[in-house]
Curated annotation (Swiss-Prot):
<dbReference type="GO" id="GO:0046872">
    <property type="term" value="F:metal ion binding"/>
</dbReference>
<comment type="function">
    <text>Protease subunit of a proteasome-like degradation complex believed to be a general protein degrading machinery.</text>
</comment>
<keyword id="KW-0378">Hydrolase</keyword>
<dbReference type="GO" id="GO:0051603">
    <property type="term" value="P:proteolysis involved in protein catabolic process"/>
</dbReference>
<keyword id="KW-0645">Protease</keyword>
<feature type="binding site">
    <location>
        <position position="164"/>
    </location>
    <ligand>
        <name>Na(+)</name>
    </ligand>
</feature>
<dbReference type="GO" id="GO:0004298">
    <property type="term" value="F:threonine-type endopeptidase activity"/>
</dbReference>
<dbReference type="InterPro" id="IPR001353">
    <property type="entry name" value="Proteasome_sua/b"/>
</dbReference>
<feature type="binding site">
    <location>
        <position position="170"/>
    </location>
    <ligand>
        <name>Na(+)</name>
    </ligand>
</feature>
<dbReference type="InterPro" id="IPR022281">
    <property type="entry name" value="ATP-dep_Prtase_HsIV_su"/>
</dbReference>
<protein>
    <recommendedName>
        <fullName>ATP-dependent protease subunit HslV</fullName>
        <ecNumber>3.4.25.2</ecNumber>
    </recommendedName>
</protein>
<dbReference type="InterPro" id="IPR029055">
    <property type="entry name" value="Ntn_hydrolases_N"/>
</dbReference>
<keyword id="KW-0888">Threonine protease</keyword>
<dbReference type="GO" id="GO:0009376">
    <property type="term" value="C:HslUV protease complex"/>
</dbReference>
<keyword id="KW-0963">Cytoplasm</keyword>
<comment type="similarity">
    <text>Belongs to the peptidase T1B family. HslV subfamily.</text>
</comment>
<keyword id="KW-0915">Sodium</keyword>
Length: 183
């Protein structure tokens, strides 16, 4: 089994609440202890725009995975869960993919998924998911806020501000994508 990469350099968070699903990510790219770029775009719409996702890990590896996920979405009629499972199968069996160092959060109207560096597909509990170096900070903050009146985007912004205050590899230059949710 391959060793999981050390995640440093980003925080990605997703919250599903009140008929919306939001994926938000910071823009910091770090090489060691140096900030190389403060405003990278690690969150984007995929395929025809019905799926949104964000990545943590090696940028080139993440774009490879985004491209492959988009192909799987095309092959499976835009069904995110099916496309993610098929990508995970490839990830586990393809020698090249097994060496990629990236994780992703992807979401559509129906489901939010975490795709791990081991080829796992996880559906988070309570509609909140986070990855990356500041992921645990953002996840904790979002879970604490989700039961209150705030909407999904407000929760994401506040949780990311907390993560940026606590994680030196996370900043407050945010990219946000939102979809209407079935739930």
């Amino acid at each position: 089994m391959s060793e999981l990469p050390k995640w440093h350099g980003t925080t990605i968070l997703s919250v599903r609440k009140g008929g919306k699903v939001v994926v938000i990510g910071d823009g910091q790219v770090s090489m060691g202890n140096t900030v190389m770029k403060p405003n990278a775009r690690k969150v984007r719409k995929l395929g025809d725009g019905s799926v949104i996702g964000g990545f943590a890990g090696a940028t080139a590896d993440a774009f490879t995975l985004f491209d492959r996920l988009e192909r799987k979405l095309e092959q499976h009629g835009g069904q995110l869960l099916r496309a993610a499972v098929e990508l995970a199968k490839d990830w586990r069996t393809d020698k090249y993919l097994r060496n990629l160092e990236a994780m992703m959060i992807v979401a559509d109207r129906e489901v939010t998924l975490i795709l791990t560096g081991n080829g796992d597909v996880l559906e988070p509990v309570g509609g909140v998911a986070a990855i990356g170096s500041g992921g645990n900070f953002a996840l904790s903050a979002a879970r604490a806020l989700v039961d209150y009146e705030a909407d999904a985007e407000t929760i994401c912004r506040k949780a990311m501000a907390i993560a940026a205050d606590l994680c030196v590899f996370t900043n407050d230059s945010l990219t946000i994508e939102t979809l209407d949710s079935a739930a």
